[in-house]
Curated annotation (Swiss-Prot):
Protein name: Sorbitol dehydrogenase
Gene it is expressed from: SDH
EC numbers for this chain: 1.1.1.-, 1.1.1.14, 1.1.1.9
Lineage of producing organism: Eukaryota, Metazoa, Ecdysozoa, Arthropoda, Hexapoda
Cofactor: Zn(2+)
Induction / repression: By cold.
Amino acid sequence: MTENYAAVLHGANDVRIEKIPVPEINDDEVLIKIDCVGICGSDVKLYSTGTCGADVIDKPIVIGHEGAGTVVKVGDKVSSLRVGDRVAIEPTQPCRSCELCKRGKYNLCVEPRYCSSMGAPGNLCRYYKHVADFCHKLPDNLTMEEGAAVQPLAIVIHACNRAKITLGSKIVILGAGPIGILCAMSAKAMGASKIILTDVVQSRLDAALELGADNVLLVRREYTDEEVVEKIVKLLGDRPDVSIDACGYGSAQRVALLVTKTAGLVLVVGIADKTVELPLSQALLREVDVVGSFRIMNTYQPALAAVSSGAIPLDKFITHRFPLNKTKEALDLAKSGAAMKILIHVQN
């Protein structure tokens, strides 16, 4: 077995490639030779600020949580995987004993260990261990790159399930970053009849048109919320059944509440502003449901199946690739907003 190298974050804008021990596995775990790892918005937040949500970097930590690789060792109690299996890593290790875990809502576990948080190391390294039942075999026709990129897709499929998207749904997605684009691709696969994406950056909207949007709206900063609502309704020909906030800003959430049709639904999947002022009364009086979505809940297998069947062309979502020793450059590019999905090939 070769040496293990990892991308280790020491603080804001301080990522280093370091040699770390190859981990010893427990009976219920597998050791994975990582092939590639995707860069996510939360990785960028950690890299840029040294914090993400409740996590504060007060000691060095391996980053990365969108990984795929090959099993090279299995624990004594593992029967579902064998050496040589190619797997996508669902980056959580729930406690399995809290009330929410027992109800199947393991994404809301009260004491989870999640990759690249202060509870668990990330997988942007050459060798990584993980609990076997959260490692999913890749279909034969999927690449390792698609296996890594399935992680954000699984997040989005859970979100779209929460949004109750069905055949014929009319959708507006506010924010054409990676999550917004994947929402469009997933909603299209679920049968949405018309999908509009909005953003303040034209290049993102151009990508959205290639990857599932029927129409797009460039939102200029001087537009009022009411002007954005009016333009969405004009493009859609109606008010949307479902409005998805995929950026997390108060302006997007206000527009979502105002534009959604009576008895429709607003899904908030992006979280950026901690406190926002919202026109809730108008939405509640029209029985507009407002729901959130957090991480992944039983959607890795559907995500893998959707990519394997061709329903979601995930390969088109991947735009940039870097070797492990260029992790800083990859994070800087992701920070600039000029890339859709960046993958790091850790064995290079």
